[in-house]
Amino acid sequence: MKRAAIIFIRFYQKAISPLFPPTCRFYPTCSNYGLEAIQRFGFIKGSYLLIKRLLKCHPLHPGGFDPVPNQTDQKKEGDSD
């Protein structure tokens, strides 16, 4: 599944994305974010992070720099003290 998702994202970047003007409000772009998230965390967790990112990518969100979190950042987020 991981390999298929990476191929799909790369296809989107090469064949579909150039047909439309740039609209992503974030850096890195949502497709680059998804590619990195899936490569780093695997298909399930990477897809979850990508979906969260895509839900934020809309005209009412200010956007900006939003990198893929490190694995240590993910652990801190789930800590309950």
UniProtKB/Swiss-Prot annotation:
InterPro entries from the UniProt entry: Membr_insert_effic_factor_YidD (IPR002696)
Report keywords, A-Z.
Cell membrane, Membrane
**Which compartment or compartments is the protein found in?**
Cell membrane
Where is this protein primarily located?
membrane
Matches recorded under SMART domains: Haemolytic (SM01234)
Q: What role does this protein play?
A: Could be involved in insertion of integral membrane proteins into the membrane.
**Belongs to which family?**
Belongs to the UPF0161 family.
Q: Which PANTHER family match?
A: MEMBRANE PROTEIN INSERTION EFFICIENCY FACTOR-RELATED
What is the official name of this protein in its record?
Putative membrane protein insertion efficiency factor 1
User: What species was this sequence derived from?
Assistant: Bacillus licheniformis (strain ATCC 14580 / DSM 13 / JCM 2505 / CCUG 7422 / NBRC 12200 / NCIMB 9375 / NCTC 10341 / NRRL NRS-1264 / Gibson 46)
